[in-house]
Curated annotation (Swiss-Prot):
The gene is plsX. This is Phosphate acyltransferase. GO terms for molecular function: phosphate:acyl-[acyl carrier protein] acyltransferase activity. It comes from Chromobacterium violaceum (strain ATCC 12472 / DSM 30191 / JCM 1249 / CCUG 213 / NBRC 12614 / NCIMB 9131 / NCTC 9757 / MK). Pfam families: FA_synthesis. GO terms for biological process: fatty acid biosynthetic process; phospholipid biosynthetic process. Belongs to the PlsX family. Keywords: Cytoplasm, Lipid biosynthesis, Lipid metabolism, Phospholipid biosynthesis, Phospholipid metabolism, Transferase.
Length: 345
């Protein structure tokens, strides 16, 4: 199956200096994939000329005259940047010319544009930002990571459904466990919103584990962790900060003396494996779940390797037909709710 991915080639902190080489490397590893690079055509052609032309036949250029700034207000970008590389890339998904879009651009503008152009899946109130994160057992999906600061219990249930289907499609989990992020594992903990959400999750067909705490994300207690965007974003940024602090401490301790530097030299093979295991670039790429099309957000400061992983995730989501799986699961949940309400009346 040939998959075509639309790339916002101008988005991110560096733009085409990252997106173009990343696209070249990605195509070298994925012979059945095509890319549409969206952006300033002369600039893209000049950058492509600097790289290996063997995969050039699988690259199309779609000219776009505008670029969304990283600090631009989402609503202004939506109103005034209708020919931006971001908007055109998402339009290609809507038109069926691409099966997914990837952008390292402004997160708020990307969410607003994607929601406006693609619309949400029937039964989904709001899209959520979902990310696959490493844990001691493997990988888990955490959502929402910042799209929705305040969420109703019904919306959090929808997040649970979407996260469960994403893990089933991308990680092969037959019946992913779902945890609700809370201040404690006991049922009595949390505010009324959390308690209501827990009740809805218990009544659903999901494999609901129960409440989980922040450390359970790293422990891999559940395959999916559901939370509102405020809590999720704080948890994500805290984890990123801790990983950076740990790396700094490690460098400082290994560099204290000739003896510790010698120990570091001896430990290089193990350190290399450790670094690879927690390398944030391998987990670059957050899915905008709940839309009628696949959109993956790369970190704005991602390097070539990181952006390549975001492209790979978009390709994997397109190949697994995750949108259809989410739509089917949500439709079944809505039918069950209607049936329960009818029986209650």
């Amino acid at each position: 199956m040939t998959i075509t991915v639309a790339v916002d080639a101008m988005g991110g902190d560096v733009g085409l200096k990252v997106t173009v080489p990343a696209s070249i490397q990605f195509l070298q590893d994925h012979p059945d994939t095509h890319l549409i690079l969206v952006g300033d055509q002369p600039a893209l052609e000049a950058e492509l000329a600097l790289h290996d032309g063997a995969v050039r036949e699988r690259i199309l250029i779609q000219h776009a005259t505008q670029v969304v700034g990283m600090d631009e207000a989402p609503q202004l970008a939506l109103k005034n940047k209708k020919d931006s590389s971001m908007r055109v890339a998402i339009n290609l998904v809507k038109e069926g010319k691409a099966q997914a879009a990837v952008s390292a651009g402004n997160t708020g503008a990307l969410m607003a544009t994607a929601r406006f152009v693609l619309k949400t899946i029937p039964g989904i109130d709001r899209p959520a930002i979902a990310k696959l994160l490493p844990n001691v057992k493997g990988t888990s999906c955490v959502l929402d990571l910042g799209a929705n600061v305040d969420c109703t219990p019904e919306q959090l249930l929808q997040f649970g459904i979407m996260g469960s289907e994403l893990m089933a499609c991308l990680q092969g989990k037959a019946n992913p466990s779902v945890g609700l992020l809370n201040i404690g594992s006991e049922d009595i903990k949390g505010n009324d919103n959390i308690k209501k959400t827990a009740e809805l999750l218990r009544q659903s067909e999901l494999h609901f584990y129960g409440n989980v705490e922040g450390d359970d994300i790293c422990k891999g207690t559940t395959d999916v962790v559901v939370c509102d965007g405020f809590t999720g974003n704080v948890a994500l940024k805290t984890a990123e900060g801790l990983a950076h602090m740990f790396a700094v401490f490690l460098r400082e301790e290994f560099g204290r003396s000739w003896w510790t530097r010698l120990c570091a030299l001896a430990a290089l093979p193990v350190l290399a494996l450790f670094k690879k295991r927690i390398d944030p670039r391998r987990y670059n790429g957050a899915s905008l779940l709940g839309l009628r099309g696949i959109v993956v957000k790369s970190h704005g400061s991602a390097d070539v390797t990181g952006f390549r992983y975001a492209l790979a995730q978009a390709c994997e989501e397109a190949g697994s037909d995750v949108i259809a799986h989410i739509a089917d699961r949500v439709a079944k949940q809505l039918d069950n709710l209607k049936q329960s309400e009818a029986e209650a009346n």
